[in-house]
């Protein structure tokens, strides 16, 4: 489970781009070499700190919902926080080998997903794979290059998942944008401003603090 992280994210432009909008296609040995090199970078990642701005576009709203995000990853434990424009924490997600816990402070609710039972990560958390073969197993993968940027275009092979497509824009293997488009029409765009590999992260930084009296739900049970 190489944190499929990130992000829980997810992320994406106001309209689905055609292949020609993403740059020149990279195929064959060049594509394999890029994916292999990216996998090697991920295998060497022991920890990660990321700061980003997220725009969430919903069909029923004219304006995007904007939030600031911060993510910490150490080993196989991840903590992800979103704060709205009023400075209020909207959600905190903690993921480890056993569970995904999502705390909504404004709703006084904690959602718990038992990974030992479901045996799979949510789609939005499982897109980063250290193994290119694993990536190709779960997604149709296309790679494009333009102006020093590489864009991975991912389409889930499982037609039952809510995700329609995902795009990851990288410069020198560092993500610049993450884009997710769901079949419901929801689009999320994540602009990454800080992406630091292997920083020092303490166990305390990965704690999820939930007040007593918080409502606990298990949405997949």
At which residue positions do the language-model features occur?
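Gly/Pro-enriched, hydrophobic low-complexity segments
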Residues: 111-113, 134-220
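N-terminal leader/targeting segments and the immediate start of mature chains
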Residues: 18-64, 210-221
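Anionic-ligand binding region
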Residues: 125-130, 137-138
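Envelope-exposed proteins and targeting segments
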Residues: 46-48, 67-69, 76, 89-91, ...
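Buried hydrophobic packing residues in well-ordered domains
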Residues: 38, 50, 80-81, 100, ...
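An acidic-aromatic
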Residues: 70-123, 188
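Bacterial N-terminal signal peptides
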Residues: 6-14
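Positively charged n-region of N-terminal signal peptides that target proteins for export
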Residues: 1-4
């Amino acid at each position: 489970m190489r944190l499929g992280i990130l992000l829980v994210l997810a992320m994406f432009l106001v309209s689905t781009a055609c292949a020609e909008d993403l740059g020149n296609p990279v195929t064959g040995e060049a594509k394999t070499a890029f994916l292999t090199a990216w996998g090697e970078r991920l295998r060497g990642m022991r920890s990660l700190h990321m700061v980003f701005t997220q725009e969430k576009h919903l069909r029923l709203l004219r304006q995007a919902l904007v939030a600031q995000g911060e993510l910490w990853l150490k080993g196989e434990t991840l903590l992800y926080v979103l704060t709205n424009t009023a400075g209020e924490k909207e959600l905190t997600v903690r993921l480890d080998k056993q569970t995904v816990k999502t705390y909504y402070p404004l709703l006084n609710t904690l959602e718990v997903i038992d990974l030992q039972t479901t045996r799979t990560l949510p789609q939005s958390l499982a897109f980063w794979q250290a193994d290119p073969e694993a990536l190709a197993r779960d997604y149709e993968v296309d790679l494009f290059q333009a102006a020093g940027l590489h864009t991975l275009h991912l389409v889930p092979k499982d037609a039952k998942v809510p995700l329609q497509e995902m795009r990851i824009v990288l410069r020198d293997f560092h993500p610049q944008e993450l884009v997710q488009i769901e079949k419901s029409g929801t689009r999320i765009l994540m602009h990454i401003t800080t992406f630091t590999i292997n920083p020092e992260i303490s166990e305390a930084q990965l704690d999820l603090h939930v007040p007593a009296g918080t409502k606990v739900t298990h949405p997949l049970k």
